[in-house]
């Protein structure tokens, strides 16, 4: 009886603290710093990766977009593996340290690739694949576990703070992204006074990314035992065997229960779905025909396996289904948002006037505005959610996410309108890309940290890291879709100029009013210029206006449908907001 009374007194004390103290645990700032350096590493590398592949490794833009999308997709597929290993064996802390070291090593191998391509391009390509593979698995160990630990910092009486906590955490993500997108292009994407790119400079950008990841890993290692702890002082994120009953909700099962039949059906489903997606994504590029089907098939399979757990209660099942539904819509957001690293970078490189404040900004650095805006607006957004919650007027998480999807549709509609009359030689003013990134930042702050918070609120603890992995898989599917959609970009001004230098009327070739000779086709192929317009669901993409309208329609429709589903999702969340 005394134990029950003491437990009740502790719970009441925590509730009173939650009402009167808005501050967050110091451990949040440790995770903030660790994630900041990891995002420096990731986004810094991302800013120069496709440019390195195209300019140094002599890959086609379409192929580099597919590789980029596949790489990002796998980076958000492996968190399922990292989440599973963490929940069952290693714990959050060990997985974060392992993942950080792996990513630092991967970036160092990219440094090696960018150092040897001039004398041995095949070795450089091999090192590229090795590096990306190591980074993919390192990210898988790191990403779901640090997000899961943010959620674990708050006892159940303080879960209402998670939207604000993840928005602050997201500010760290984007501070790191800003620094990475500033420093890595400055040292790695260098042009001389004549505008000629130094294709041997990319290595310094990759080296900077590796050093940043080592700093982030060291920060976590040194500070984790002092600050990443429960309110009672117990370390968070240790080995799963060290969990105690207080770590779980009342009546919550502490272990998942999968029947042999469920596991067998999961294997069969994965194989069947792989071949279905392989058929739907027919082509010659192995990224598109092997990696993308694996991402989609494994995501659906694991989602089905989790809800087959016999220990799930009705409330837990409904909440997990909300995570799945929201994840589906977030896929369309990332498919549009992640054009930043592929098609938007190519447009910034080839068809944008980047002259700003008397300086020609490198194309890989244009993405930096997103990081600047997130860092500037994340804290005001967190204050906004706090004030609305205090007045009991805070929108439901799914409404915030529908607003985010709607905003990204608006951003692409504006850019589509401004490229409509560019023609083959006009330049887009950089102010329009800056406006696009501003609106997309508002969209991101309404959607991404809120999604992370929602997973933290709705996940049963025994599935916490794994469900973050599943949630990140929606990002993976979005990134894979981003790669496929990014490859739809039609010929930009530089392609028409190069074709003209070769004596070829590219516009006439694309319009099919002139039949190119075999020699002309060979010249176009050699110079990485397509002789036909890209196709999307049976429609030909003739220009940048049509290209950007694809994203307007995808995200606009997704926003409307998610908003209409909100009453049903509210009911399924069973009191969670």
Annotate the PLM regions.
Residues 47-67, 189, 288, 340-366:
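Short amphipathic helix-loop junctions that connect adjacent transmembrane helices
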Residues 74-75, 161-189, 205-216, 367-374, ...:
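Glycine-rich segments within core transmembrane alpha-helices of 12-TM secondary carriers
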Residues 88-103, 157, 387-408, 427:
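Cytoplasmic membrane-interface "Motif A"-like loop-to-helix N-cap segments
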Residues 1-26, 156-157, 188-345, 350-355, ...:
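Intracellular loop-helix junctions on the cytosolic face of multi-pass helical membrane proteins
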Residues 36, 106, 119-145, 327, ...:
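Hydrophobic core of transmembrane alpha-helices in multi-pass small-molecule transporters
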Residues 69-88, 104, 143, 178-180, ...:
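Central cavity-lining transmembrane alpha-helices of secondary-active solute carriers
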Residues 98-123, 401-425:
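C-terminal ends and interior cores of transmembrane alpha-helices
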Residues 186-211, 279-291, 393-399, 428, ...:
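A membrane-interface helix-boundary motif in multi-pass transporters
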